[in-house]
């Protein structure tokens, strides 16, 4: 059966609750260069945003940001046991995979995306992964969503995006796709 529809999913907060994974990874990475981050600040200012957006808010310069991000990516898999899977969304994706292309569009790194998908044995469900390294413009820019639609030759009208964050929803709106907002699970 030829597919002509597409489902795009965000990673953090949509497919997985990774708040603790990311918080612990960043907290430990920041500690290595003598910085600290409080949980409430992380939730409000950092989670779901690109590291170059929030790390300057705690006083890091460009070089320090790159060091912290590199350390964070290295530490990420040590905290995967803290992640929670959105089993209902994954069940829906499993039911849809014969009629829809399924792609991940995330601002997370490819390394961290692959690690969590492999940890939960869900990597094979995705026909395409567009990670932070694959785009020039991060969400709220729709580049990642548009790239996925172009890859599969599927129109925005035949695309459904699952997103949780304001920037992700803004990017989905700009792409012209249909949107379902994922709430806490």
Question: Across the structure, where does each feature detected by a protein language model lie?
Answer:
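Metal-dependent phosphoesterase signature
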Residues: 37, 56-94
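Helix-loop "lid/cap" segments that line or gate small-molecule binding pockets
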Residues: 29-30, 49-63, 116, 148-149
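Active-site neighborhood of HAD-like aspartate-dependent phosphohydrolases
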Residues: 1-44, 174-175
């Amino acid at each position: 059966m030829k597919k002509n529809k597409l489902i795009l999913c965000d990673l953090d907060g949509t497919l997985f609750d990774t708040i603790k994974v990311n918080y612990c990874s960043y907290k430990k990475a920041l500690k290595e260069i003598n910085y600290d981050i409080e949980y409430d600040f992380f939730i409000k200012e950092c989670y779901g945003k690109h590291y170059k957006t929030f790390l300057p808010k705690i006083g890091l310069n460009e070089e320090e940001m790159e060091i912290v991000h590199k350390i964070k990516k290295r530490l990420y898999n040590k905290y995967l046991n803290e992640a929670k899977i959105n089993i209902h969304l994954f069940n829906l994706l499993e039911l849809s995979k014969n009629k829809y292309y399924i792609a991940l569009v995330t601002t997370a790194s490819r390394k961290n995306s692959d690690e969590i998908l492999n940890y939960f044995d869900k990597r094979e469900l995705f026909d395409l992964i567009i990670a932070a390294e694959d785009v020039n413009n991060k969400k709220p820019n729709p580049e990642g969503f548009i790239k996925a639609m172009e890859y599969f030759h599927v129109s925005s009208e035949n695309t459904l995006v699952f997103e949780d964050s304001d920037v992700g929803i803004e990017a989905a709106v700009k792409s012209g796709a249909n949107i379902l907002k994922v709430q806490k699970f």
